[in-house]
Amino acid sequence: MRAKHQEQPSLFGDTEPAQHVPRTNERPEAAAMMEVLRALRNHPAVAWCERQNSGAFRTETGQFVRFGWKGCADVIGQLRDGRFLAVEVKAPNGRLRPEQAAFLDQVRGAGGVGFVARNCADVARELASCIN
């Protein structure tokens, strides 16, 4: 039997604490996404952030439509200091694909902040390392 996770204390002062999201084997990346988005949205250095959906579908007329682009981070946004933010969310054992690593490198090379996050602790650590 798994031990129950307790609510984590606030990582960012007076903001609402990010909570560890219990993970199951069915959708570990979805649980990570919820946890990471909450941590980003509650961080005082983040002006805004949104999930980037990507994929494809076939319309009623049979036309194949793609949206998003290959390698784009799962979450994009902007820091309050104006820098672009890109976060690739991964499950505990997930690995970056080469095009995802290239996208994050491009963001960092242009002066933005780009990183991989698996949980709220990763968000806190990465943002602390790039904020004065």
Predicted regions and their residues:
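Catalytic phosphate/metal-binding cores of nucleic-acid and nucleotide-processing enzymes, i.e., regions
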Residues: 1-132
